[in-house]
Regions:
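Helix-loop-beta segment of a Rossmann-like dinucleotide-binding subdomain
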Residues: 75-85, 97, 103, 107-112, ...
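Helical element adjacent to the flavin cofactor pocket in flavoenzyme catalytic cores
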Residues: 131-180, 184-187
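C-terminal catalytic lobe of FAD-dependent flavoproteins
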Residues: 281-362
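N-terminal Rossmann-like FAD-binding beta1-loop-alpha1 element of flavoenzymes
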Residues: 5-30
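Glycine-rich FAD pyrophosphate-binding loop
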Residues: 24-43
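Dinucleotide-binding Rossmann-like beta1-alpha1 core, especially the glycine-rich loop
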Residues: 47-118, 126-127, 240-241, 278-279
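Short hydrophobic core segments
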Residues: 8-10, 184-196, 335
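Active-site substrate-recognition segment that forms the wall
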Residues: 21-22, 50, 73-80, 193-316
């Protein structure tokens, strides 16, 4: 073998980088990444925001617990979020406010006039909404670079173009064959491979959990008049769109979840067209042109909660995957939780029980 480590983390996106940063000063850690740069896939394509309602009430503790570190690192910019509904969707709006207000999120219901004051040129049929004033934009690149730098400072090794080719279970751990020809040993193998999480498990002889990737599309568009910087993140209570301002432009998404194989995701023209059509149903402000479009993969376990913990059938295989679209905003708390579980130490304030792999045990 070329080297031996206590822990090998598969994947150098936000999940793998944040976890490695927490582990590096307490174990000998290697992060392996198949691409030629970290964060090429989901992390590098995220239109991330920190909003406590995103992901549902069970994800909320991870988001809330992550807030202080994200603020301390200076990667949050106040934005506010406004979830809106048409005439006839008042009950959905009321249920949204009751659900998230009931778990401690600051929310307030708005009437038509209050919504229109925040969304210029709002069309008449949008009459009800819920404001989350605490929502912020996240500087994803800065956060990811912080974790990579912290991991490096803590002594973590990062090998690029070194995807996992094969994993053999041996007494006391694993013998790993990498795509670059190197072979390494480790005590614990951590699966932080995002859309490839089940594939990594399969290479290790571990039963996949059904973590499935779904494509999400975003388009950057120019509108007339120019989008105001003070515009909040605007979401549909029915889950059909969201949009937010970005340097005088707008980022639009049709909130698509198209099943996909793990891949270098690319946007489909139909999804870009849907995003524009749904935006123009909300605001009387035509899209002049599409300047950029991209897609990323969001990966979910069958119950749409992340998976953090040792595999129930193999105590040397650790799941750190299935973070869906909320992996960025929950990264600090998830890393603390994951490191605590891995090392048998304090995992912070979040209860790990809802996220354990044991819930899928057959």
């Amino acid at each position: 073998m070329d080297a031996r480590f206590d822990i090998v983390v598969v994947g150098a996106g936000m999940a793998g980088a944040s976890l490695a940063a927490r582990l590096g000063d307490r174990a000998r850690v290697l992060v392996i990444e198949a691409e030629d740069r970290p964060g090429y896939h989901a992390t590098g394509r995220s239109a991330a925001f920190w909003t406590e309602s995103y992901g549902g009430p069970l994800v909320k503790p991870l988001t809330t617990a992550s807030g202080p570190e994200l603020h301390r690192l200076g990667v949050l910019t106040p934005r506010g979020a406004l979830t809106i509904g048409r005439m006839g969707q008042e009950r959905q709006i009321a249920a949204f406010a009751e659900t998230y207000g009931g778990v401690g999120i600051e929310v307030s219901t708005l009437n038509r006039a209050e919504i229109a004051a925040r969304i210029p040129d709002l069309k008449a049929e949008w009459t009800c909404g819920v404001l989350e004033p605490s929502t912020c934009d996240i500087d994803v690149a800065a956060l990811h670079q912080h974790y990579l730098a912290a991991a490096r400072k803590a002594g973590v090794d990062l090998w690029l173009r070194a995807g996992l080719a094969a994993a053999e279970r041996i007494p006391g751990g694993w013998a790993l064959a990498l795509a670059d020809g190197r072979r390494v040993g480790c005590d614990v193998l951590v699966d932080a491979a995002g859309a490839w999480a089940d594939a990594v498990a399969g290479k290790a002889g571990v039963h996949p959990l059904g973590i499935a990737p779904y494509r999400r599309t975003i388009a950057q568009v120019a509108v007339e008049p120019v989008a105001p910087d003070a515009l909040p993140l605007v979401l549909d209570v029915g889950g059909r769109f969201y949009f937010k301002p970005e340097s005088g432009r707008l980022w639009l998404s049709p909130h698509d979840e198209t099943p996909s194989s793990p891949c270098d995701a690319a946007p489909e023209e139909i999804d870009v067209a849907l995003a524009i059509d749904r935006f123009e149903q909300v605001v009387d402000r035509p899209v002049l042109r599409v300047e950029h479009r991209w897609a990323g993969l969001r990966s979910f376990a069958p119950d749409r909660l992340p998976v953090y913990g040792f595999d129930p059938q193999d105590g040397a295989f650790f799941w750190f995957a299935g973070q869906g679209g909320f992996g960025i905003q929950t990264a600090p708390a998830a890393a603390v939780l994951g490191a605590g579980l891995l090392l048998g130490q304090d995992g912070g304030e979040v209860d790990p029980w809802p996220f354990g792999a044991r819930r899928f045990q057959r």
